[in-house]
């Protein structure tokens, strides 16, 4: 998922996506623990997607407070 796509989503949609990604990350970590995970790079991708979503949410919070200068 690209940041541009995330920015087009509403804040509620982003929060729902974060919850979905966290659940996927939990499942991936479980699979890794039982040696059943084939694509270990997916863990990194999911963690990065969560971080990108949270960053966009935080940017919106700061913008609403008027603290973003850019």
Swiss-Prot record:
Signal peptide start and end residues: none
Keywords of this entry: Ribonucleoprotein, Ribosomal protein
GO biological process: translation
GO cellular component terms given for this protein: cytosolic large ribosomal subunit
Pfam families for this protein: Ribosomal_L29
Alphabetized NCBIfam families for the sequence: L29
Similarity comment text for this entry: Belongs to the universal ribosomal protein uL29 family.
HAMAP family with a match to the protein in the record: Ribosomal_uL29
Name this protein carries in UniProt: Large ribosomal subunit protein uL29
Name of the gene: rpmC
């Amino acid at each position: 998922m690209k940041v541009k796509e995330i920015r087009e989503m509403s804040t509620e949609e982003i929060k729902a996506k974060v919850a979905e990604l966290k659940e996927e990350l939990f499942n991936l970590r479980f699979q890794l623990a039982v040696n059943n995970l084939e694509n270990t790079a997916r863990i990194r991708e999911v963690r990065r997607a969560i971080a990108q979503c949270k960053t966009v949410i935080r940017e919106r919070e700061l913008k609403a407070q008027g603290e973003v200068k850019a």
